[in-house]
């Protein structure tokens, strides 16, 4: 992976998180978590972290060669198959996007 992904995930308002963060110790296997993204309750993406191109460990090793990581830092890994850009599905005002990660929870974001 390249630092270009890091740059594209780091601009203002582009990385909603919460309402909580789960400590790494509470995640039994980060390489085996089910993921789902819906827009207005229609499934757009569904997958598992086991299918990631690079493992969490590989991402951290590569990233720390470029920048130091400190406690509390968040590493954005990307999404599973089904990215809307390639299907020309774009969010519009009034849409609600829901992201779910097994064992962590779900995040609901309205589009304004």
Residue ranges and their predicted role:
Residues 1-112:
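Catalytic-pocket segment enriched in acidic/His residues
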């Amino acid at each position: 992976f390249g630092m270009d992904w890091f740059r594209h995930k780091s601009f203002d308002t582009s990385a909603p998180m919460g309402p909580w963060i789960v400590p790494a110790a509470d995640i039994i296997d980060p390489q085996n978590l089910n993921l789902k993204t819906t827009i207005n309750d229609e499934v757009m993406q569904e997958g598992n972290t086991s299918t990631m191109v690079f493992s969490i460990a590989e991402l951290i090793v590569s990233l720390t060669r470029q920048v130091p990581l400190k406690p509390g830092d968040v590493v954005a890994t990307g999404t599973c198959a089904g990215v809307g850009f390639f299907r020309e599905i774009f969010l519009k005002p009034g849409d609600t996007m829901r992201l779910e990660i097994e064992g962590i929870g779900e995040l609901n974001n309205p589009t304004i």
